């Protein structure tokens, strides 16, 4: 499967979620030094090849801030920009999301920070977490594959939902720093893949 086909596949998955991914979700994918990105405003239910463009030569533009950050990251190859319902509540409040579920500790990390929409802040945030919240905007989830970025999107919304609902009865108990680090490192080690295996996402 080529890059555009892979992006379209995950766009359709996002469109089929039982909740909204926000008014303008986007997908960014890096392959062989090139960056591909869905056009702003694309309806993921009806995505076509024309909705996916290469932006490698346009990384200095306002529209490609996240793509420029992805280009700088060494291991991550995919990003999803979305504002799901419970994550949106944290963005509105300007608060980071802490890990209260093992899934989040393993797949995303201990804490999802709030950052400004700048290449440097996004890059720095994603060096230690698989997600960041852009102040007043949306969440960015990333991964070594689109599957990982998509999984992080699902886990982040699930974690935010648990945190919000638990706040009614005094708040969720967050996982400790050491436990989070151990779970995260185990996940990365256990599910690490060679470059050839990662390329299976492209080759099908």
Give the role of each language-model region.
Residues 1-204:
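Glycine-rich flexible loops
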């Amino acid at each position: 499967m080529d890059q555009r086909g892979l992006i379209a596949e995950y766009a359709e998955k996002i469109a089929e979620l039982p909740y909204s991914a926000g008014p303008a979700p986007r997908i960014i994918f890096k392959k062989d030094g090139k960056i591909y990105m869905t056009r702003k405003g694309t309806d993921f239910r009806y995505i076509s090849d024309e909705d996916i463009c290469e932006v490698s030569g346009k990384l200095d533009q306002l529209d490609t801030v996240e793509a420029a950050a992805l280009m700088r990251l060494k291991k991550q190859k995919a990003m999803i920009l979305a504002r799901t319902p419970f994550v949106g509540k944290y963005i509105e409040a300007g608060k980071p999301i802490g890990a209260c579920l093992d899934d989040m500790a393993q797949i995303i990390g201990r804490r999802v920070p709030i950052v400004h929409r700048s290449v440097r802040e996004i890059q720095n945030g994603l060096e230690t977490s698989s997600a960041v919240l852009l102040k007043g905007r949306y969440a960015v989830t990333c991964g070594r594959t689109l599957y990982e970025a998509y999984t992080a999107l699902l886990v982040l919304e699930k974690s935010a939902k648990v945190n919000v609902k638990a706040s009614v009865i005094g708040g969720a108990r967050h996982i400790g720093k050491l436990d989070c680090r151990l779970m995260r490192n185990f996940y990365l080690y256990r599910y690490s893949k060679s470059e050839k295996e990662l390329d299976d996402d492209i080759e099908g």
